Design a protein with these regions (language model features):
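Post-transcriptional modification and biogenesis factors for structured RNAs
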Residues: 1-118
Length: 118
């Protein structure tokens, strides 16, 4: 299993950041990087529950490029279905398909979320 880095781009709701940290801990992931995040208040730590350490140890950077500089693979997430002519390839995968694709990968993988309004 590769080392997985979760990258949050411009998170605006600190409670959501806490929920991400909690989910990360539940699945054994510990590396969180945030690009220009909101301030983390007590709400983030309440939502994180046992995963406050992930919030305390999170890397904060000012650019997306800086966030993924140490990653060999970068995977974006989206709930938006696009139509029309695009200049990139979007290949939707289920979580199971994504896990299967990572089998045998040893390099660091960034899984990118955000911004929350896109």
């Amino acid at each position: 299993m590769p080392q997985v880095k979760v990258v949050l781009v411009e998170p605006r709701v600190d409670g959501n950041v806490g929920a991400v940290a909690r989910s990360m801990a539940n699945f054994g992931f510990t590396e969180l990087c945030m690009v220009r995040p909101c301030e983390l208040t007590d709400e983030a730590f309440k939502r994180a529950k046992h995963a406050g350490y992930i919030l305390r140890e999170a890397q904060v950077v000012q650019s997306f490029e800086e966030a993924v500089a140490d990653c060999f693979h970068v995977v974006g997430t989206s709930g938006i279905v696009t139509a029309g002519e695009k200049h990139y390839i979007r290949i939707p995968l289920t979580p199971r398909e994504f896990a299967d694709r990572l089998e045998g990968v040893e390099e660091k993988v960034a899984v990118v979320f955000g911004p929350e309004d896109t």
